[in-house]
Amino acid sequence: MQQYLDLMKHILAEGVDKSDRTGTGTRSVFGYQMRFDLSKGFPLVTTKKCHMRSIIHELLWFLKGDTNIAYLRENKVSIWDEWADENGDLGPVYGAQWRSWPTQSGDAIDQIAQVIAQIKSQPDSRRLIVSAWNVGELDKMALAPCHAFFQFYVADGKLSCQLYQRSCDVFLGLPFNIASYALLTMMVAQQCDLALGDFVWTGGDTHLYSNHMEQTALQLSREPRQLPTMTILRKPASIFDYQFEDFELTHYDPHPHIKAPVAV
């Protein structure tokens, strides 16, 4: 994935040094876009090994509407541990907003079910949108949504998706985010009987943490390898019925994992 390495180079060359909420410090650019043709391979970074099992389980957890890390812990996924309270709760984060956005009347909107119904019935709609950025509930969330807003687009029988990520940890978080939304696009396309188009990633505050610079240099020294293939082995009755075993990643030959600290 040369696009990802090019982003790192751009931040190092053009970025500005900024303070941040975690106190770690970043080198940051504002506004960046990458496009991945999903018909040409699954966009999983190859210049370091990425933990696809965690990515899949996290996405399934979002789609369940779950906001407690018990499911993740059961499946040996620890990426949310630092933000959960003593009971494993995170407040109304992604899953809650995707599946049960509260309304003034006391009802809840299932944005995922709604957008899939809209794609099927009104594929040319410009309102094929899901938002996790609920201003009225931000103060209840353990972490405000970083990948905040995504939109689907149908053309020539193909489904594309664009994500707006307001804040992006490029070294640790971004490979997960790209793979997660690429997989979500594949799932929605399958449910709507559409071919695969592009995944477009758009970043706001796009940064490398100051304690990731050595790791970034190591990654930039490596040559990207051929993208792997992701296969969905069955088509379940709905977007909410996928299981971990439904996904098969093949031809993934990454460089070794690179460890880096998480800024909390």
Swiss-Prot record:
It is found in: Cytoplasm. Its main location: cytoplasm. One of its GO terms (molecular function) is thymidylate synthase activity. Its EC number is 2.1.1.45. GO terms for biological process: dTMP biosynthetic process; dTTP biosynthetic process; methylation. InterPro entries: Thymidate_synth/dCMP_Mease, Thymidate_synth/dCMP_Mease_dom, Thymidate_synth/dCMP_Mease_sf, Thymidylate_synthase, Thymidylate_synthase_AS. It comes from the Bacteria. It holds the Pfam family Thymidylat_synt. DUMP binds at residues 21, 126-127, 166-169, 177, 207-209. (6R)-5,10-methylene-5,6,7,8-tetrahydrofolate binds at residues 51, 169, 263. Pathway: Pyrimidine metabolism; dTTP biosynthesis. It catalyses: dUMP + (6R)-5,10-methylene-5,6,7,8-tetrahydrofolate = 7,8-dihydrofolate + dTMP. The active site is at 146 (nucleophile). Signal peptide: none annotated. Keywords: Cytoplasm, Methyltransferase, Nucleotide biosynthesis, Transferase. GO terms for cellular component: cytosol. Coiled coil: none annotated. HAMAP family: Thymidy_synth_bact. PANTHER family: THYMIDYLATE SYNTHASE, THYMIDYLATE SYNTHASE 1. Homodimer. Belongs to the thymidylate synthase family. Bacterial-type ThyA subfamily. Catalyzes the reductive methylation of 2'-deoxyuridine-5'-monophosphate (dUMP) to 2'-deoxythymidine-5'-monophosphate (dTMP) while utilizing 5,10-methylenetetrahydrofolate (mTHF) as the methyl donor and reductant in the reaction, yielding dihydrofolate (DHF) as a by-product. This enzymatic reaction provides an intracellular de novo source of dTMP, an essential precursor for DNA biosynthesis. This is Thymidylate synthase. It comes from Shewanella sp. (strain ANA-3).
